[in-house]
Amino acid sequence: MEPSKFHSTVLARPPGMYDEDDDHRRRQRDILNPPAPSQTGPGSGGSSSAGGPRPPFSLRSPTQSEFHHQSSQHHYSASSAASGPQSTYNGANNGVPQSHSHSRSNSHSRHSSSSVLHSPYQQASTASRPAHALDLHRSPQTSGLQAPQRSPGLHAPSVYYSQESREHHPPPPKPIDKPASSGRSFYDPLTDTTTTSTSDRERRTSDAGSSWHNATTNAVSTPTHRDAYNSYSKPAANPSPYYGNGKYTSPSASIYPPRSPASHPQSVATAAAEPISPPTRPPRMATPNILNPTTTSSMAAMSQAESPAQKAAVPAATPSRAAELMSFSNILSSSEPAPKPRPRSPVLAETPNKQPEPEPEREPTKEPSKEPSKEPSKEPSKEPSPPPADMDETSDSPACPEKPAEVDAETEPDAEIHDDVDTVDGLEESEKPEPPIKREKSAKVEKAPRRPRVVEKEKKERVTKAPRKSAGAKGRASEVKAESTPKQSRRSSGKQEALSSSRVPAKRQANGLTKQKAQALEQEKAVVAEMEQLEEEALDESEARAELRAFKKRKLNRQKALETTDLSVATELLPSLKDEAINRHHRRHDFSAEMVLKLGVHVALGRLRFGDHNYDAALKEVREQELFAEKERKKDMQRKRRREKSMAVTIEQKEAALAKAHATEDKLERQKLLREAERANKKAQQTKLILQKGIKGPARNIMPMDVNLEGGSMATFSADSMEPGKGKGKGRAGNRPKKSKEQKQAEKEAAEAAQAALDAGQELPSKEENPKIRIKVNKGKLSKDKDRDVDVDTIDGDNTEIKDTEEPPPKKKGKVVEEVKDTLETRFQSKGYNQIYDQIWRDMARKDVSKVYRLATDSYYTKASNLKKTAILAAKEAKRWQLRTNKGMKDLQARGKRVMRDMMTFWKRNEREERDLRKAAERQELENARKEEADREAARQKRKLNFLISQTELYSHFIGKKIKTDEVERSTDRPEVAAEEQKNKPAGENALTVKEPTGPVGAKVTNFENLDFDAEDDETLQAAAMANAQNAIAEAQRKARNFNNDDEPDEDGEMNFQNPTGLGDVEIEQPKLLTATLKEYQLKGLNWLVNLYEQGINGILADEMGLGKTIQSISVMAYLAEHHDIWGPFLVVAPASTLHNWEQEIKRFVPDLKIVPYWGSASDRKILRKFWDRKHSTYKRDAQFHVAITSYQMVVSDVAYFQKMKWQYMILDEAQAIKSSQSSRWKCLLSFHCRNRLLLTGTPIQNNMQELWALLHFIMPSLFDSHEEFSDWFSKDIESHAQSNSKLNEDQLKRLHMILKPFMLRRVKKHVQKELGDKIELDVYCDLTYRQRAYYANLRNQISIMDLIEKATLGDDNDSGTLMNLVMQFRKVCNHPDLFERADTSSPLALVRFAETGSFAREGNDVTVGYTTRSVVEYILPRLLWRDGGRLTKAGSDNPSAGFRSRYLGEMMNIWSSTNIRESVDGTDNFSFLRFADTSIAEAEKVGKTDLFARASELAQRRNRLANMHVSYDDDEEDNFTPAHALFLIRQRQDRTALSEITSEGALQNLMNVSHVMYEDANLPRMDQAARPGASAPPIEVVCHTSSTQIERDRVLFNVPMRKALFGPNLDEQKEFVLQKVPVEQLPPAPLLPKPDNERQRFTSITVPSMRQFITNSGKLAKLDELLFKLKAGGHRVLLYFQMTRMIDLMEEYLTYRNWKYCRLDGSTKFEDRRDTVHDFQTNPSIFVFLLSTRAGGLGINLTSADTVIFYDSDWNPTIDSQAMDRAHRLGQTRQVTVYRLITRGTIEERIRKRAMQKEEVQRVVITGGAGASSGVDFSGRRAPENRNRDIAMWLADDDQAELIERRERELLESGELDKVAKKRGGGKRKKVAKDMGDGGGVSLDEMYHEGEGNFDDNKLSGAATPNVPDSTDAKPGKKKKATGKKAKTTKQRLAIADGQMDM
C-alpha cells in the first residue's frame, strides 16, 4: 500500500495544503534520526547503532517543525513534571482509536483500533503490516495530528479561531543557516503563561536533554499509536523511581481525567490543546526505563521496506531546523530549563565501521535506550561534551559517514532493551533489581565553552569496559553493551545543540507577525530556577504511596465513567454501534492487561542491565572509600600520638613552672610562673579532653574562623596575615615581622655558641658582613604610604637591594632647543599681554616663593627626623642579638630553680595524694556505717509501722465480727447487682487470718521504747499488737459503761446502754416514734449504727449523698429514746445552710423530740443555754430539750459551755469540715464529753489521705493516735504513688480496707435505690470566641515557663497566690470576657454643661434635673434689654408705651376684631372672602389673636368635611358640585386621602403599605444603627441672669399642652382613656411629631450595649443560651452552678433579657433568706432557673424539683461538684437527672477537669476498693498541702511544660535541693502554716480557688441570726481579746469586703 493512500479505518484524513510529492518529502524528513550513509547499506539492516536495531523514539531535535507530539507523550522533563492537568492529558491518552465524529479526529484518529493503549508496544498483528509503518511517518499536515501553527505560547482551543485560521498550515521550514533570534518565547507550565527569553543558549536543549524516550542518534523514530479515550493505565508492579532523568516526578498521575468525546464536543479542541501544553509523566503502568525505547527488528524491517530514495534523503543526523511556531517540540524545548552537563560514563569502544548482523523480525516493541553510564566517569572531561551528530551543522550532508551519534548518558541505565519479549517473559520477580537511585548532578561542565563539533580525540579517550555476560535472559541484554557507539550526556548534548544550531524567532502572534518582546529575562530565569528546585525536591515515600492509592481510586472511577460514557455516546449516535463499543472496550482492556505484563518483564531486564553496567563502578567507589577511610584513620592515629606527646610536654612545663614558682621568692616572678603553669595546665586539659571525646565531625577539614581585622585577640591566625596597624611603641610603625621556628632555633643556637665561647675564654667569631641594604629616597615629596611599602622581611632576611621605584630620571644636560611657538601663542605677543604676564610672575615671586620654600624646608626636616629615628631603631635592632648572649647564665640559674621547684612539687603532691586517699577511706567507712544504721532504722520503723497496722487490723477484726459492716454494705435493695459484684471479688479478698486468743489478755504496751523492734521476733510483736487491740476494745466498752457513773443501774436487769454486749446479733426494728418508713438499706444502716453504739465505738456513715443519712441519724435517736429511754442530750452539729433542714426533719419525723435551735446572737444563745440541764447525764421524756442543733462556728465560739455538758450522742453532719486535725474545730469537738460520735459525710476523702486519717483519729483517738509512722503510712506512703504515678500496692490497699471496714459504712445509689432515676453526665465543649482568644493569648504570653517551673518546685505561699491569680484570670477569660471589662453605654461627645449642686443633703429626697443641661455656646442678653425696656412689647415701669400699643394697636385698632370683620364682610370689603372660605367671624378673630403653635394644633384636630361631602356627591352629573360657602377651598374639596392612610386594618392595609410592612418585618426599626454623630449639644439659648427669665423659659419648656400636642398621650394615659371610656371626640389629637425611625434609640444618640453581642462574646454563654432554649421547650427545670459571684451577676442580666424567671442563692444570701429561696423554687414551677454558687448550694439542701444540673465552670475538687449535683439527684427525685458540664476546649478548664477525674478515681479506689487497685490509678492529681504550687502550676502548664516541671522536681529531689529549702524555711513555720490552714486564718487551695464565690462556711453569716465570731484556739474561753489598732486584713477578709459581706 502506498504511504499516502493509507487512511484510518474509522476516520477520514483531513485535506492538506501540500501535494503528494511534498507529502512524500515531508515523510522522508519525518523519519527521525535515520542511520548514517555508511551504516544504511544492505549490511546494516537499517540499524542505527552497532549493537542494536533502530529505536522507535529517537534523539531528533525537538526544534524540527514536524516533531510528532504523539512521540513526545513520554517526553519527560522538569517542565512536564509541573505541567498540570494538560500534561496528564497528553501523556495518558494515546493510542485508542476514535469512534466519534470526524470533527474530533485531528488529534485522535492516528491509527486503527489495533494500536496499543498509550504504550510503546504493539500487538504481534501489527508487525506484519508494512503499510502501518508507512502510515506512522505521515506528515502532520496529512495526518491531522497538529493544530494550525500559532505562537508557541498557551492559546485557547482551536475552536476559538476561525475556520480559515484553523485550516491554515505552517509555512515550510526556514533554512538551517539562518541566525537564531535574540529572544524567543516558550510556554511556562508553572504560571500557565508564555515567557520570553533572550538567551538562546539557556533556552534551547536537545531532544536528548528534553526527552527521555530517545535511543541512539541514528535510530529511526516510530511515533506512538494514539487511542485517546481508553481507560487509565494500570500501575506497574515496580513503580518508577521518583527521579527519572535526574528530574523530580510525582509517583501519581494528575487528578484530572483525560478528555472524553462526550465531555468535549468541540471538533478540534483537543487537537489544538495537545501541542500547546507539554506532556506529563509517563504512563503509570511502565517505569521511565521502558519509556526510553529502541526499536526492534520489526521496526527495522519497516524502515527497510521503504524506498531507497527515502533512505538516501534522510541524513545520518537530522539537522537542527527552525522550529515551527506551534510545534510541540518547540514548546517543550523552550520550556525546559538550561541543562546541566553530566560527567561522562565509561562506555564500550568499538570500531565505528563494524556493522552488526541483521536481527530477525520480532514484535515491534519499544525498548528503552541503553544507558550503561549511570555512574560518573572516573575522569570527568575537562572539555565540553561534543554535540550529537544530529546537532552538527554539517550532519545533514552525506560527507559525514564516520561520525557516530552519542547516546545520552543521563537517562536510566536500563533505557535500551534489545531482548525479545518472549525471551524475558519467564523472568522471575525476584530477579528484578530495585529501581535506581537519583544521581548527583555535576555542575563542573556547566561553564565550559561552547564547541560546534564533536572532537574525535575525546572519543579515543573513552574508557573501554568489558561486557559482563549473564546467564539466561540476561544474555541478550549484555550483548547490547558491546555497542561501539560512544555515549554522551544528554545535558551536554542539549547544550551543544543549542550552541551549534540556530533558530528562527519564535515570538509571534496568532496572525504570524513577530511579537514584541514583553517579558524580562529575570522571569525566565526565575522559572528555570523553580524547575531546578522541583527537580531537587524529594518525595516522601508515604506521600508517594498515598498519591498512588488515590490515583488508582480515581482511575477505577474514571474507567467506570468512560464505560458509561462510551456506551451512552455510541447508543445516542447509532444504536447499532453499541455492541461494537462494548467489544472495543473489552479488546482495549485485554490488550492493556497483556501489555502490562510485557512491560513488567522489560522493567526487570532494565534493572538487571543497570546492575551489570554499574557493578564495577560501584565496587571501585566502595574500595576508594575504604582506602580513604583507612588513610583518615592513620591520620587520626598520628594526630592522637602528636597530641599525647604535646600533652606530656605541656605537663612537664606546668610542673616545671610550679616548681619554679614555689622556689622563687620574688612575688612578681612567682605570679608570672603560676600564670605559665595555669596556661600549661589548661592546654593539657584541653588536649586531654580532645583525646577523650575527640573532635566532633571532620575537624581537620574545618577552616579556621575568619580573620578578625577589626581588633580583638584571636589564636587562629598569625599576625602577619593582618593589615599593618599601629605599633606598640611611639617610634614603631607596624608590627614586627614574625620569625619562623628555624630562624628562632638558629638564633638560639648562635647565642648558645657565643656563650660557650665566652665561657671558654675564646673570642667571639667575627660577624659575617652582609651586603648593605641601600635605600634610596627621593628628595621629592613621597607619600607616607610609599614610605611604608618597604618590605621589612626583605630588609631583615634577604640581602637584596631595595631601590625606590619612583627615582627621578637623571637630568639631561645639553643645549636647549627652542620650540616652535604656536600661532595662537604668537597672537598674544603684545605689550599689554607681556605686562600682565610679568606682573603675575612678580606677584608669585613676592608672595608664593617664600611660602613654598618654607613648606619644602619643613618637609625636608621632617623627613630627616624620621630617617634619623629609623636609623636609631635599626641600630638597636641590629644590636639586640648581643644582648641575648647574656641570658645563658640566667637560664642556668632559672633551670636549677625550676628543677628544685619541680621536686618540691612532686613530693608535696605525693604527700597530698596519700593524705587524700587516707581521708577518702575514712569517709567511705563512715558512709558505710551511716548507711547500715539508716537501713537498720528503716527496718525498725518498718517493723514498728507493721506493728501499728497489725494492732489496728486486729482491732478492726474484733470489732468487725460484732458490727458486721461488710454484711451491711453487701446487703442492698438490688440483690442482682450485689451478687454480680460479689462474684467478681476473689474468695477471701479481705479476709484476715487471726488466731483467737485463749488465755488472759496481755498487758497493754503504751511506751514503744519498751519494745525492741530490732531484737523482738514477729510472734512477740504480734502478741503485743493483739494485746493492745483487746485492751482498746475493753477500754472503749469500759468508757461506755462508766459514762454515767452517777446513775444507778436498772434493777430489772433490762438491756440498756450500760450492758450493751448482748446486742451484737439482735435485729432491730424501725422505732415507732419515727413517723416515716425506712427503706431496707436504711434499716440495715440503723442496725449498724445501733451496734456501734452498743459497743461504745464511734463510726463514719459515708453513704453517697442523697441516700438519707439524716433520717438514719434521726432514727438512732428515736431508737434510743424508745427502747432505752435515753432522750438525750443529743448534739447535732451541721453547716449553717442545713440547720433549718435538720430542725424541719426532726420535727417532721420524730415530733416527740424537743429541739433547741442553738444559733443567733450572743444574748439569744445565753437564753437558750438556760434549757440545758447539766446535773443529769441522761434526759427523760419530760426534759426541757432533747436535741441541740448548732453550727460548727457556734461550737467553736461557745466551746466552754459545750464542754460542760455530757452528750449521749454527737452527730457531725458534713464531717469533711473537720478534715484537718490541726484545726480548732477538730480540737474543740474532740474535747467534748460524748458517749458516741457519729460522722456523716458523703465524701470522706476530698483532697488527700490525710483527711481520712483525721476522721479516723477523731472517732477513735486511743487507737488512731498521732503516731507519726501511722500518719505517714496514710498520707505519704500511699500518696507516694501519686508522686511516682505508679499503681497502688494491692496489699497495702487491702490492709487499708480492712482498717476502714468496721468504722465506715458506705453505700452508693446504684446499689440500694431502685426507684431513683438515672444520672447522666455530659461534657459540653465550647470554643473560645475571637475576643476570648485575644485575651487568652495575651495572658499566655505573660507566663514565663522558667518562672512557672521555679514557683512550682521551690515556690512558697506567696508564689501560690501569684499562680492562683493567674488561674483566676484564665478562668475569667473562659467564662466571659466582660468579667475583665464591661461594654459600657456610649454616646457622642456632649458639648454641654451639666447642673451641679453643692450638697445633696440640702436638695431633699428628690432632685429636679429636667432641662438642666446647657449649651457651651450661650447668647447672653443684658438685663437692660430683657427687662428694663428693652423689649418694646413687654409692659413695665420702664416701658409705658408698651401698654398703649397693646391697648390701641392690639385691641382697639386691630383689624382682626370681630366688630371690624363683621363690618367688612359685606360686598367687596376686606373680609368678604370669609363667606366663601367656610370660616366664621369668630374663627377669623381667633386666628388673629392666637399664636402659631395653637393654630397648628387646632388645624391638626380639624377634620376635612368637604372631602367627605365630595364623596357623598360623587356622581357623573354632579361633577362640579361645590357648596356655596366653600367656593375658595379648592384643595380641601378635591383632597382625597390616600387609601394607604385611611386603610388601617385588614389585608388591605398590608397591601397598601407594603414598604411600611416590610420595614417592620425586617426588624429595621429595632436594629442598632451603623453610625452615630460624633458630637451632640443642646440648642443655643438666650441667657439673662434674672429670675423672670427662668420663669418664662420654664413656662415654655414645661408647657403640658404643647408636649401633649407634640408627643401625644403616653401609654398610661391611653390606658386610662380606655378604662374611663372617654368618648372619641374628646380624645387628644395625634402627635404632631412623627415616630422615630429607630424604636430602640428613638430621638437620642446614646447607645446601650447589645445583649446579643453580650451573648456571642462568650463561647460558654452562647452554648448555654442554645441549651436553655431546648430545656425550656422540654419543660425542664435547671440548677445552674457557678464559682464566681460576678458571673452570677452577668447571668442575671441575661435571664432578665430572655424574660425567664429565676432565683439566686450564693454566699452573699442572708441566712434567713436561704430557706425561703429554696422553698420558693421547690413549690413554684414557674421558676425556670436556680442560680447557685457551687459551694453555697452544695450542702444539705433539697432541690429535687429540678431535673437538670448545669455546671457553668467545674471545680478542681470533684467532691464539690458531686455534692452540688446531688441536690437534685437524691431521695424524692422521680425523673432522670441530666448533668451538663460546660468546658472550654483547649484551655485551662480541660486540664482542671482532667485532674479532678484523677482525684475522683483515687477516692473511688481507696474507699470502695475494686478493680481500680489492680488496673492502676493515676495519683498525679493529688499533692500534699505544702506542694500546692505544683497543683496550680499543672493547671497552667501544657503537656510539654508539665513534663518540664516534673523533670525539674525530680532533679531537685535527687540533688537534695528540696530538703535544703524545707530546712531553710524551718519547721516552726510549717507548723504555723498548718495551724493557720486548719483554723481558717490562712488561705487554703480551696479558698484561693473559690475566691470569687465569697464565704460559704460558718465564719460569716449575714444578718442578726448568726454574728461572726472569729475562730481562734489561742484565746481562752470567756475572755475577750484586747482591741488592737488597725491590723492588716487577711485575704479572706479582703475578699469578704470586696463581696460586700464585711464592712471596712
Swiss-Prot record:
Q: Which parts of this chain are annotated as the region Disordered?
A: 1-518, 715-815, 966-1003, 1862-1944
Q: Where is the composition biased (Basic residues)?
A: 101-111, 727-739, 1862-1873, 1918-1932
Coiled-coil region list: 506-563, 624-696, 908-953
> Bias category Low complexity: which stretches?
73-83, 312-323
Mention any Pfam family matching this sequence. SNF2-rel_dom
Chief place where the protein resides: nucleus
Q: Where is the composition biased (Polar residues)?
A: 84-98, 139-149, 208-223, 289-307, 327-336
Domain Helicase ATP-binding: from-to ranges: 1090-1262
> SUPFAM superfamilies attached here?
P-loop containing nucleoside triphosphate hydrolases (SSF52540)
Subcellular location(s) per record: Nucleus
Q: Which GO terms describe its molecular function?
A: ATP binding; ATP hydrolysis activity; ATP-dependent chromatin remodeler activity; DNA binding; histone binding
CDD domains documented for this protein: DEXQc_INO80, SF2_C_SNF
Keyword terms of this UniProt record: Activator, ATP-binding, Coiled coil, DNA damage, DNA repair, DNA-binding, Hydrolase, Nucleotide-binding, Nucleus, Transcription, Transcription regulation
Where is this chain compositionally biased, Basic and acidic residues type? 356-382, 429-464, 740-751, 782-791, 800-815, 966-986, 1887-1900
Q: Where does ATP bind?
A: 1103-1110
Supply the InterPro entries for this chain. Answer: DBINO (IPR020838), DEXQc_INO80 (IPR031047), Helicase_ATP-bd (IPR014001), Helicase_C-like (IPR001650), INO80/SWR1_helicase (IPR050520), P-loop_NTPase (IPR027417), SNF2-like_sf (IPR038718), SNF2/RAD54-like_C (IPR049730)
Q: Which reaction equations make up its catalytic activity?
A: ATP + H2O = ADP + phosphate + H(+)
This entry carries the following GO cellular component terms, namely:
Ino80 complex
Motif DEAQ box extends across: 1213-1216
> Which residue ranges does the record assign to the Helicase C-terminal domain?
1663-1818
Single Gene Ontology BP term?
Answer: CENP-A containing chromatin assembly
Read off the domain note. Answer: The DBINO region is involved in binding to DNA.
What family does the entry list?
Belongs to the SNF2/RAD54 helicase family.
Give the protein's biological function.
Answer: ATPase component of the INO80 complex which remodels chromatin by shifting nucleosomes and is involved in DNA repair.
Under the subunit heading, UniProt states:
Component of the INO80 chromatin-remodeling complex.
Q: What is this protein called?
A: Chromatin-remodeling ATPase INO80
User: Can you name the source organism?
Assistant: Pyricularia oryzae (strain 70-15 / ATCC MYA-4617 / FGSC 8958) (Rice blast fungus)
Gene name on record?
INO80
